[in-house]
Amino acid sequence: MKRIFAIGALLLGSVAMFAQPQLTKDNIDEVVAAMTLEEKATLLVGSGWGSMTAGSMTASATALVPGAAGTTRSIERLGIPSTVLADGPAGLRISPIRDNDPNTYFCTGFPVGTVLASMWDTERVEELTTAMGNEVLEYGADVLLAPGMNLHRNPLCGRNFEYFSEDPFLTGKTAAAYINGIQSNGVGVSVKHFAANNQEVNRMENDSRVSQRALRELYLKGFEIAVKEADPWTVM
C-alpha cells in the first residue's frame, strides 16, 4: 500500500511539473500569472558589478558572453532564459580573449553618439546601427545598454561623448533611428539615463534640480520622441 501511495505521489508530482506553462512569444501573460512573487522579484533584480563568485549572476553573465555587463536570472521551470545585457553605446563591448580559446572575439568600434548626431542623417544612423545590432545578435547578447541620450549641458561632463547633442529634438530623432537599427535584428536596447543625468560629480554622484517646464521641454523630450517613434525594449 505504501508503495502504491509513493508511486501515486510521484506521478502527481510529474503531472504538476509538466503542467507548468513554458514561455513562448504567445503566452507571456500565462507565464507571468504562473510566476511566484519571489520569481518576479528575482527576475527584476538582475546582476550588478558585484562579486564574481561561482553561482553569482555576474559570473553567470560572464559564462554566457564573457565581458557582458550582466544578466537576468533564468527561471527554468517556466522556460524563461537569462537575458544577457552588454554595454554600448559605440558598439558591443565584450571580452576579446577567452580562457582556453585560441580565437579573438573582435567587435567593431562604431562612431560615438555625438558623431552620429553631427551627420544630421537619420537614415545613415539607422544603417550603421543595423550593423551594430547584428554584432550584438551574433555574439549572443540580448540587450545593448544604449543609446545614451542625455543632453550636453556642461563641457566637463565626462560622458558627453556618449550623448548626441544639446538639442532634445535632434537627440530624440537620432535616438529613434539608432534604436530602430539595433532592434531590426531581433535584439533590444536600453535607452539611458532616464532622466536629467546630464552631469555627474566624480562619476558616482548626481544632484539634478530642474523646473517642471525645463524637464518637459528639454530633458524628457528626447526620451518621449524615442519611445513614441522606436518602441525601445527597455529604459535605464
Residues covered by each model-derived region:
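Bacterial Sec-dependent N-terminal signal peptides
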Residues: 1-22
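Glycoside hydrolase catalytic-domain context in secreted enzymes
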Residues: 19-236
